[in-house]
Amino acid sequence: ILFNSTQAHVTMGHLSTTRDDPDRLALELANRMLGGGGFSSILMKELRVKRGYTYGANSAFTFSQAAGSFSLSYSTQQDQLMDSIQVAHKALVDFVHQPIDAQQLEETKAGMLRSLPNSYSSNANINAQLGSIGFYQQDANYLADYPKRLAAITPLDVQNAIRKHIHPESLTLVIVSNALDKEQLRHILELNLDPNIKQSMPHPDQIPAIIEPPEPMPEAASPDSAQTDEPALI
């Protein structure tokens, strides 16, 4: 999508699974590790901390009665667009194919449990949680059993769920930019997906030390429409 701006905007993703999928909790853990856990997540480390491509990168699953979606997104300077796509896509490919680190998984579980009280920080949050339990016909002990179900998930469970439900070779990319080289983009994605080719990622030394601030949004979202931070409805 052509758009005249100093910032380029990138989203890549594909359809995913339903809310009642047995892998859902493992996928929520995986997402927290990949891009849903702030500065501790893989995408933030690769795109912001190491290279300064963006102020923020995130990933997300949506789950409902019908098939939801998996996506990752970020914004960057126009002249860093192709390098950033190479890094983000390669990080996703590696996440799918490399083993899950057991210590990182346990830290992610602990973080999810610590953030659980945020789901009940207001009457509206409590009402939403109870409504979700009723709508999806979950057991009355669903919330009480949540920590035990979370603790029972192993690195292999997460790895199997990732390989079943995340497909770097089947992504749809939406790129808002005033200068996109589609042939170069196709070449980058093909190289990332080829296990026989070892690519060198853009090194932090190649990146300017200062990132220009993003352009202000034309209209701020109202408090009623603002999205809340993690965790989503459990």
Task: Give the predicted meaning of each segment.
Residues 8-18, 31, 44-155, 168-176, ...:
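M16 family metallopeptidases and their MPP-like homologs
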